[in-house]
């Protein structure tokens, strides 16, 4: 999926705003690979969520003139990019497909679970024709528990809020549309889902590819670098899309290039 295709996919939800519905699901803590549960939300609040997140999608994709779309396996440090998740997908992220394919997921029982048991939200926007699902982590600062004292305005006075309540802001870390899972917040992904292990696994394939052509004498030196995700990402690029390896360039030409190229000399 390139940027033009992505804009076309996302624009559907903007152009068909009135025909798009919204459902919200929760991924619970300490539930392993269990399916997400649906959160029962009143219609007025759902309409507010739809407005917030359709606008947030628009800002993410359309309001950034320098935006690019890259594969996650070849990610770099550029700021204005969305990353297509082209690596092994963790089980928690696979629940996004569950939301799209299943209409009768169980509801969240608030008598058994408090709001602090929610790890992340899945916001599904769409209709029978097309869906987009947003993945949003839920920080504890957005959950207000009964242990605190919170007041709300009531006519001319303040009254105590007795129940837990949840603040849902705009913004999200990932979204899936038309079968493509895209990462918005790369830092969040790197800290979650065992992402570093996934990158190391893919990067090890890159080291193996270098070893196969006998370009280095000691691959253990390269394997030690994989504990640093910055270097692991670079070897992931080698495994997935190295033009040098794909072209079968002889080792002596590779070495000669490295010896003569200004920024590589002496490395």
Task: State where each predicted segment sits.
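Charged, amphipathic alpha-helical stretches
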Residues: 2-53
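Short amphipathic alpha-helical segments that mediate assembly, nucleic-acid/protein binding
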Residues: 3, 219-222, 231, 250-254
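Acidic, low-complexity, intrinsically disordered interaction modules
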Residues: 32-213, 232-267
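The feature represents the first ordered module of a protein
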Residues: 200, 216-225
């Amino acid at each position: 999926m390139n940027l033009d295709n992505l804009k076309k996919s996302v624009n559907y939800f903007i152009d068909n705003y009135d025909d798009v519905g919204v459902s919200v699901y929760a991924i619970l803590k300490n539930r392993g690979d269990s399916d997400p549960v649906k959160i029962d939300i009143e219609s007025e609040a759902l309409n507010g969520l739809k407005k917030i997140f359709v606008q947030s999608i628009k800002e993410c994709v359309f309001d950034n003139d320098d935006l690019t779309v890259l594969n996650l396996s070849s990610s770099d440090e550029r700021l204005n990019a969305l990353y297509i998740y082209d690596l092994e997908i963790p089980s928690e992220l696979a629940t996004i497909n569950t939301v799209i394919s299943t209409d009768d997921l169980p509801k969240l029982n608030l008598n058994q679970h408090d709001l602090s048991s929610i790890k992340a939200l899945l916001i599904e926007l769409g209709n029978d024709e097309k869906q987009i699902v947003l993945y949003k982590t839920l920080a504890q600062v957005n959950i207000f528990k009964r242990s605190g004292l919170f007041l709300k305005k009531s006519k001319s006075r303040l009254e105590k809020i007795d129940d837990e309540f949840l603040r849902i802001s705009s913004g999200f870390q990932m979204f899936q549309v038309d079968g493509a899972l895209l990462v918005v917040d790369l830092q969040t992904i790197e800290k979650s889902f065992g992402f570093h292990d996934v990158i190391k696994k893919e990067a090890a394939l890159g080291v193996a590819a270098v070893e196969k052509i006998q370009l280095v004498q000691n691959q253990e030196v390269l394997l030690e670098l994989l504990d640093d995700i910055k270097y692991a990402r670079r070897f992931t690029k080698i495994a997935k899309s190295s033009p040098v390896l794909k072209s079968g360039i002889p080792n002596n030409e590779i070495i000669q290039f490295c010896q003569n190229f200004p920024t590589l000399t002496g490395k």
